[in-house]
């Protein structure tokens, strides 16, 4: 616990509010007291150690007694170089926390993602009930994109097609993508802006497919949330690019590289796989990227929260 031994209580609290929240309460209290001790607040640290001691297990008890034996020894001061190292470490960790993609699907901040997954699964159940998700007549009836029908006035197909899937594997792959990316993008944009980007990417990708359809493709059905999910890939890339430029966050730069890799692999896969719409995937990613570039996000660190390593 670098930050605890450096007396940086706020940084330790940030760790316990994030990745280390799973640690037992006595362990967290021990390290917070250690941070206070190293910061020179020996009386506060002693009080916390004394409160922990009666209920501590043998390992924790030994560690507490070791700290108490040094309670009267003043901590060694840090020079400017050491302070910079600690500040850089705290900044890098903060970026990893903020730009990490491991947001929980079951968080209260992922309501839109939960709703979208539920709607996609529900529509797949309806497909199966009416005759099967691989039955073209069923898909057409429920709203698959069919360019002649859309040109005849059935514009609602541009939306409905994004909630239909051809087979369980198609549904599973798209829902995994939504599960992986949705909570982070929703956290960054908020409920309404997230839904706006998701639907813009989906409808926009379907409209692009229809606009450039010709020959045999003009008479084919198109379904799937792939354009929406690729829109989230583009949205994530946009958020990471903005954060990298705004905060010089290396964590955001690395995630941006990951999004570019995903798009590249998707293009490669589409180019060698029949009956897969590269047009929908690429247009969805581009729309998602462009939409987020003009929307506000919630990832910017307020000035009052930037110096998190001060004692």
Where in the sequence are the language-model features?
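Sensory coupling linkers of modular signal transduction proteins
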Residues: 43-44, 60
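A detector for small-residue-rich transmembrane helices and their helix-helix packing motifs
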Residues: 15, 27, 34-38, 48, ...
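Structural marker of alpha-solenoid helical repeat scaffolds
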Residues: 21-22, 54-55, 59
